[in-house]
């Protein structure tokens, strides 16, 4: 009614979460497809955090302009120069970790779609190569009991622990205390915890996609793998490679994932969509004008 541009952001792969609503029997994939297409095609443009989202929306039949703009983070919140080595040592000690232990960190909501089970299933292979490896799982969620049963089944109680939910102010400390951050989630549209870990200076070994493969495009930042079965070999290979950190590469990447860069990209998209909206309004007015002329001509012929 107001005839002004409307920008929407589409950040969630809703199909991955349907099982939470009536065990997936109330809302189906076809409903998500229809509603997403209906809404998105009534906007001027849609912001997507990754190519995966764009590909999904195109498959739904969305024809509105789409642009990849990953959500930026507050870099300083995770760089945290105030965190000392003493702070890190104190945390590791509270987790029962010795100096020679490799702290492998998983930090997320503990739910089925986060695929933490793949990390646990692969961990026996990891500790066969690195007996000093310890998996620390941070977070809470509905899938804890199932994972605890899996840990017991694989006899990994000595090597895997849950911390529960931690205070938001302590998240950066956990990243910094870890030797490696890991994830096998396939439900991520961009993976903010990955960029948070990167900002904290912790290398990541994560299940990849088009966006993440570009994010971790330098060995000093981390490594991606393709399937659940690839997790353990990928982590073992990365640990054994002892890739040195590259501050210049990290700083360049941190700008790309910063809230500052995100803001600049959003402003540019807004400006582009204002122009696009004006052009679309003119085009529709011209089409309406031509249609009115046709109607008048037809009335004269009669």
Model-derived segments and their meaning:
Residues 52, 72:
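Carbohydrate-associated surface elements
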Residues 98-114, 120-123:
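Conserved donor-binding/catalytic core segment of Leloir-type glycosyltransferases
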Residues 145-166:
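Nucleotide-activated donor-binding/catalytic signature segment of Leloir-type glycosyltransferases, i.e.
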Residues 165-166, 173-178:
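Short alpha-helical donor nucleotide-sugar binding micro-motif in glycosyltransferases
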Residues 186:
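Aromatic "clamp/platform" in nucleotide-sugar-dependent glycosyltransferases that forms part
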Residues 203-206:
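Short hydrophobic beta-strand element within catalytic cores of glycosyltransferases
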Residues 218-229, 236-243:
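Conserved acidic donor-binding segment of nucleotide-sugar-dependent glycosyltransferases
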Residues 243-295:
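A charged, aromatic-enriched C-terminal amphipathic alpha-helix characteristic of glycosyltransferases
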């Amino acid at each position: 009614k107001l005839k002004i541009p409307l920008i929407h952001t589409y950040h969630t792969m809703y199909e991955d979460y349907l099982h939470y609503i009536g065990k997936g029997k109330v809302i189906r994939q076809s409903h998500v497809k229809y509603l997403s297409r209906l809404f998105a095609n009534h906007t001027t443009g849609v912001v997507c955090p990754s190519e995966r989202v764009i590909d999904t929306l195109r498959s739904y039949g969305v024809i509105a302009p789409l642009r990849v703009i990953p959500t930026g983070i507050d870099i300083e919140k995770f760089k945290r120069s105030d965190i000392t080595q003493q702070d890190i040592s104190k945390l590791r000690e509270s987790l029962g970790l010795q100096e020679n232990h490799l702290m492998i960190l998983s930090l997320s909501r503990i739910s089925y779609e986060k695929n933490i089970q793949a990390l646990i299933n692969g961990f026996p292979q990891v500790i066969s190569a690195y007996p000093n490896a310890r998996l620390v799982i941070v977070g809470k969620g509905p899938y804890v009991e199932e994972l605890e049963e899996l840990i017991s089944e694989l006899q990994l109680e000595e090597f895997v622990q849950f911390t529960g939910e931690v205070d938001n102010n302590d998240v950066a400390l956990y990243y910094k205390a870890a030797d490696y951050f890991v994830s096998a989630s396939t439900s991520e549209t961009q993976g903010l915890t990955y960029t948070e870990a990167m900002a904290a200076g912790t290398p990541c070994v994560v299940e990849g996609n088009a966006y993440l493969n570009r994010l971790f495009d330098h060995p000093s930042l981390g490594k991606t793998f393709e399937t659940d079965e690839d997790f353990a070999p990928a982590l073992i290979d990365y640990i054994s490679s002892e890739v040195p950190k590259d501050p210049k590469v990290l700083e360049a990447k941190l700008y790309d994932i910063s809230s500052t860069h995100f803001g600049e990209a959003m402003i540019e998209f807004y400006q582009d969509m204002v122009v696009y909206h004006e052009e679309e309004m003119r085009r529709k007015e011209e089409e309406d004008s031509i249609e009115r002329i046709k109607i008048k001509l037809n009335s004269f012929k009669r």
